[in-house]
Amino acid sequence: MREGGAGEGQGAAVDEATGFEVGIVVPKLYRGAAAGCGEVENCVARLVRELEDVGLIVERVRGVPAEFIKLSAPMGTLGRVAAEMNMKKLTYIGMELQFEWDQVGAFVRQPDGSLFSWRERFACFRHLIYSIVNKTDSDITLSFDDKEFHWTQNESLLTRLEDEGIVKLVFPLHDEIKRKQLLRSWALKWFDFTWQPIDEIYSYFGTKIAIYFSFLGMYTRWLFFPAVFGLATQLIDFGSLQWLVLPAFFFFVISWAVFFLQFWKRKNSAVLARWGINYSFSEYKTMGNELDPLSFSMADDNVQQRKFGAPKEKSIVQRNEWFGVLLRIRNNAIIVLAIICLQLPFELAYAHLYAITKTEALRYVLTAVYLAAIQYYTRIGGKVSVTLIKYENNQGEQSSADSLVYKVFGLYFMQSYIGLFYHASLHRNIMALRQVLIKRLIVSQVLENLIENSIPYLNYSYKKYRAVHKKKHEKESPAGKSVRLSTRVEKEYLKPSYTASIGEELEDGLFDDFLELTLQFGMIMMFACAFPSIFCFAALNNVTEIRADALKLLVMLKRPAPRDAATIGAWLNIFQFLVVMAICTNCLLLVCLYDEEGKWKIEPGLAAILIMEHALFLIKFGFSHFVPEEPAWVKANRGRYVAQAQNVCSKQLLRSIAKLDAKLE
């Protein structure tokens, strides 16, 4: 991008322009067919002309698989569109106000100096291209190849072309300069371990992806502490104090997890403040959707005379609230029954087969087959979850996405841990449990990384082969001439999208990445006492995961469409739930380790374990209140912004009152 800093003034800002950040894909016509359109105007040529008329910079690229229309926009064009969309942006007094291009200097710039974030720019692009409508008094006849159709009055041109199958795809384009910079400073810097340029990631990919990598980096750094402690418990002989090692490690791990999650909340709020994102306002906008049914019911001539506190409006809101709660209870009950009746027997059968299998090689094969087979079951469960969510009264897309997260995690929770519970509680064989943990962690991580990195590459290679093969057999192609993809945009078009394996209409690819992370966290936390050095495997895997995910996003996939998410959402609640589960399961493991006779009596040792369990629950809920969720400087800035806003509003109100008094006199 070619965006300048905040001090260059509005005149310079008008001349700034983004890079080519959006692409439109249309079928490629033979040159003769494209030239001989007859009297009827070609629809692609009309689309290009309309895009230029609304102020966009257009470049047409004729590639091997299709023709591409690349779009860029001057800052002045984006500014006028943002004002037309009533876009809210943070000002220097801390208030989010409706954007006005004439007052551009009042609005906070992004960390990279640009006026608009990637999410805001992409929203402006989509609004521009989809708001091109037929403003004439009659229908317009357009053609493509031998096909003719009518563009009716007040109809979106791009939507009509999509319905006709002419526009195949509208997708974000990589900025080649920034992409290469991130490759050098982030994806290929393996020796930086957990350090990442989070501000640059935010500027390029948007809030949601940047928050994920910020969380992954902090989680990996904090993993080194239990990894060192866990390794020490395996390598060092503590002599007569050996019996205290595992309880001490258990106490340390739970305290570590509680502090980590609490300090993540602090970092999350600090990062949002640095990016100029008002999270409380985002929550307000999401909660505002809850009043949509009410607003429709009040849409009449006397709406301004109504009061929100009227009994009718209260009853409408309460009815919608409880109806949504009952729908969620019903759908969650369906998922729980499906897990108990269908998945639980399958998981127990696998655990039993694993226990009776004697050969290690066969156990690895059995685990691999099980992990592959369970994918189909979870995909079916995910589709059922998406269908159920459509009938829930969720307040907005984020609420629906959170509901999907909870339901799908329930399926994976049973899948991932029931076999481990089987070995821990029924057989009480800690050595067998350690072997299962190692196999699960190694096999699952190898399979996940193999799928994540190989399938996108194979998908791209297959699409590339098909496009080149098709081009060689076209009439225009000269015989014997080699055909290859020569432009960046056509290579990006053939790459897979960053989508979720389950419920892609609600979530992007971060769903799978967060799911993998939570399952790993649950495994290392709930069975920490059985295998303390498992934290070393997790830390090593996550260091690799940071760079592998970065390469995946920058090299192997299309640029993801930005999503507005200021936190990790429902995943944080799942992490906290897993900490509570870890307290229970590790107490059970300590009972199995110290109750060698299997009498399960409340002797002093077992009583001490129960006391420890209650103490850890107290720590879990107590430490959360001792560590503030926001740093002091964030609270101080908010207070200063509130004071500034009150001062400005009071002065403006006094001026308005003075002008009114002058008119009355």
UniProtKB/Swiss-Prot annotation:
The keyword Ribonucleoprotein does not apply. It is a multi-pass membrane protein. One of its GO terms (molecular function) is chloride channel activity. One of its GO terms (biological process) is chloride transmembrane transport. The chain crosses the membrane at residues 209-229, 243-263, 333-353, 361-383, 404-424, 521-541, 574-594, 607-627. It is found in: Membrane. It holds the Pfam family Anoctamin. The keyword DNA repair does not apply. InterPro entries: Anoctamin (IPR007632), Anoctamin_TM (IPR049452). Keywords: Calcium, Chloride, Chloride channel, Ion channel, Ion transport, Membrane, Transmembrane, Transmembrane helix, Transport. One of its GO terms (cellular component) is chloride channel complex. May act as a calcium-activated chloride channel. Belongs to the anoctamin (TC 1.A.17) family. This is Anoctamin-like protein Os01g0706700. It comes from Oryza sativa subsp. japonica. The lineage of its organism: Eukaryota, Viridiplantae, Streptophyta, Embryophyta, Tracheophyta.
